[in-house]
Amino acid sequence: MEIQCPETCIHLAAAREHPAAVVKKQQERDVAALVPTIKHLTERQQQLFFLFHSVILRHKPEAFSRLLDEDVGQAAGAVAATLETAGRGVLYEHTPASLPAQRLARDMTAALAEIRARGTRIFDGEAAIALRAIEAGAREARKNPADDTAYLALVGRLLHARSQPAADEEVKPASSLILP
């Protein structure tokens, strides 16, 4: 039986503040896996790194496809290559090999354009460095052939991605649990 508690539930807050030992060990492993890919980034590049990860986590593959670590690496690499090429004065859009990676790359490019449209100044070089770090992290996670979504799971845990129902899905009613 599952109880649907709101985010403000005091019991959930206590569980987040004092996680179980297994959860704490997993968090330590996750941070240890991510640090090598971001240790060379500046603060601004780290912000872009996590911004692109939020785009990756929000991305919904179409139809029967699913997003894999390889797709994340291809998409990040292609967008980074496009930005690096533009920095040299050549307009050429690099394209990832897989269709899910192409769609993710399109979403990443759209997010970058949207942020720039709001007036935020983002240099192509900074964004490319952050994307190359994502590509390296996804490539490193692919070394474990048993799990082809290890990097996505890692990022989801670190960003505390909570599954939100889609707009067309039915929302379950809240729990009838009464707290004093």
What are the roles of these predicted feature ranges?
Residues M1-K25:
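N-terminal cysteine/histidine-rich coordination modules
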Residues I3, Q45-Q46, P173:
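Generic structural motif recognizing short loop/turn segments at the entrances and edges of beta-strands
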Residues C9, L51-H53, A80, I134, ...:
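Generic preference for hydrophobic/aromatic residues in regular secondary structure cores
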Residues A21-A111:
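Charged, low-complexity interaction segments
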Residues L83-P180:
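C-terminal, charged low-complexity interaction regions
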